[in-house]
UniProtKB/Swiss-Prot annotation:
Domain of life: Bacteria
Protein name per its UniProtKB record: Large ribosomal subunit protein uL22
InterPro entries named among the record's database cross-references: Ribosomal_uL22, Ribosomal_uL22_bac/chlpt-type, Ribosomal_uL22_bac/org-type, Ribosomal_uL22_CS, Ribosomal_uL22_sf
GO biological process: translation
Transmembrane regions: none
Annotated source species: Pseudomonas aeruginosa (strain ATCC 15692 / DSM 22644 / CIP 104116 / JCM 14847 / LMG 12228 / 1C / PRS 101 / PAO1)
Gene: rplV
Residue ranges of coiled coil: none
Similarity comment text for this entry: Belongs to the universal ribosomal protein uL22 family.
Amino acid sequence: MEVAAKLSGARISAQKARLVADQIRGKKVGEALNLLAFSSKKAAEIMKKVLESAVANAEHNEGADVDDLKVSTVFVNEGRSLKRIMPRAKGRADRIVKRSCHITVKVADK
């Protein structure tokens, strides 16, 4: 049995979120949550909430035991980008791209 949780439009770039996703992929849920709790990255806090949601979905919907669950799949896709303008000297302007991403975490009991 495989259960998923998804967060759409997380306000962090996909590149930064993938660094954290690579750390927890394939690990047991308890170990992954512990790793995320002590990470200093912004993406770790976001990823922890999504993982906890996936675990809660597995418990509530499938009646799974938390000790048997492991992170089977984690992937991060690019979301919408907000384009902003930063005024510069001599009438110029630079474009600022505020990136977002979609995070999907799947947990399985095998």
